[in-house]
Amino acid sequence: IKHINDQFIAHFLEAVRAKQGQQFYAVGEYWKNDKDSLDKYLSEVKYKIDLFDVPLHYHFFQASQKGRDYDLQELFNDTLVNDHPDLAVTFVDNHDSQKNSSLESQVKDWFKPLAYGLILLRKDGYPCIFYGDYYSIKRKQSPHRPILDILLDARKKYAHGEQLDYFDHPNTIGFTRKGDEAHPHSGLALLISNGEDGDKI
């Protein structure tokens, strides 16, 4: 949508929602790894559209490339979901990030379960799973589907209530969800690590 006039988008969505109701959902892809540009766009369209959190995707990409040399405490720095949690569509990979594409930035396989855990089980953002990660790419069955099914089930049953973050170590971070009365037995803890050391008490 970065090549479409932003005022047109704002007026178009106003017109559609006047007919279809204010809950009519819209999301745009503005592929730029610069949160300030995305902030400006959201302001120009009067916050009428959600955006894919491209900066978060690039954090995941860098984390998967650097391994233990990436500071996990910085994963959500300068991301849409950090500043606009209700307008951010969080994702790990998509068709644009695949190998040999013009925007190649594919998250390595080892980090994908960690990244999906972070977007599916946290309270902020609107998580989106890449078709290729759940089903297949080039008719080859995805190895990620079993863990995604577990995470989706955990999201449905347990990812409710207040969230407490423990982003206090460069190689080991985590968070808890306290659960709520509307979802009996809900609540969870997620811990991720990209190195050998680190602990949470």
Language-model features, listed with the residues they occupy:
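Active-site-proximal helices and loops of the catalytic beta/alpha 8
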Residues: 2-201
